[in-house]
A protein has these predicted regions:
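Hydrophobic "anchor" residues on beta-strands that sit immediately upstream
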Residues: 4, 61, 232
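Asp-based phosphoryl-transfer active-site loop
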Residues: 3-17, 91
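Conserved acidic, metal-coordinating active-site core of Asp-based
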Residues: 108-232
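Active-site phosphate-binding/coordination module
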Residues: 22-132
Length: 237
């Protein structure tokens, strides 16, 4: 009997306007009404994941940043996993040497060196998911995140680790050259302390090896006393 469902967000729970569809809201509520716990499991940071949920009356736990951060329904942090200096250096050196653009995700925000490039990337993500990208809405959302401080524009990423309390949780890399980015991803994945995944063709999501959705989902199931045979990890609800 299914007791726990994990659902992704981009290209599944969300539409092209980055909103939770009415159909998916109703599906989540139906599952919850029948005693099933629904968890959002996403590569997004919490402040990105919670924004579309806040526009609804849903209450759900979150697995964020591919498992680097887990929060309960009341937003309390249950667990975190970050990248130390040596791992960050290993990742960024590989990306820079191959001229691959990337963003840095921390416990406090997302760092970018080029918001215009971010716009093109988010449009590409939507289109690769088979959606028609709402360019104006995506552009406005980027500006809104810059204004509220969750997207931080910097000249370079070198000083992030020097900020007190700032922990690097994930590196998100993009490149249109699929062969190149696949090669770099395979090289980084050979490190026993790194987990490398991809949410769409042309990107890499790099976290600590302890930060994986499957690990986080297993931990939530254990906490709730749910056997893994009663868990579904789905791309949509």
């Amino acid at each position: 009997m299914i007791k726990l469902i994990a659902t992704d967000m981009d290209g599944t729970l969300l539409n092209a306007g980055h909103e939770i569809t009415t159909m998916n809201q109703e599906a989540i509520k139906f599952a919850q009404a029948n005693g099933i716990t629904v968890v959002i499991a996403t590569g997004r940071a919490f402040y990105e994941a919670q924004t579309p949920v806040a526009e609804t009356d849903l209450k759900v736990p979150y697995i964020c940043l591919n498992g680097a951060e887990v929060r309960d329904e009341s937003f309390n942090i249950m667990s975190t996993s970050h990248l130390n200096h040596d791992l960050v250096h290993k990742i960024t050196t590989a990306l820079k040497n191959n001229h691959i653009y990337y963003q840095i995700y921390t416990n406090r925000g997302i760092y970018t060196e080029d918001p215009k490039r971010d716009l093109a990337i988010y449009i590409d993500i939507a289109e690769r998911a088979g959606q028609k990208a709402d360019v104006d809405k995506i552009r406005n959302n980027i500006q809104k995140r810059i204004d509220n401080g969750t997207l931080k524009v910097v000249d370079n990423y070198d000083s992030i680790e020097d900020i007190p309390g700032e922990l690097i949780m994930k590196v998100l890399a993009f490149d249109a050259d699929l062969s190149k980015i696949d090669q770099v991803g395979q090289a980084l994945a050979s490190s026993p302390n790194l987990a490398v995944s991809s949410s769409s063709r042309g990107n890499l999501e790099i976290t600590h090896s302890n930060a994986q959705k499957g690990i986080a989902l297993s931990a939530i199931a254990h906490q709730l006393g749910i056997d893994l045979t009663d868990v579904i990890d789905r791309k949509s609800v």
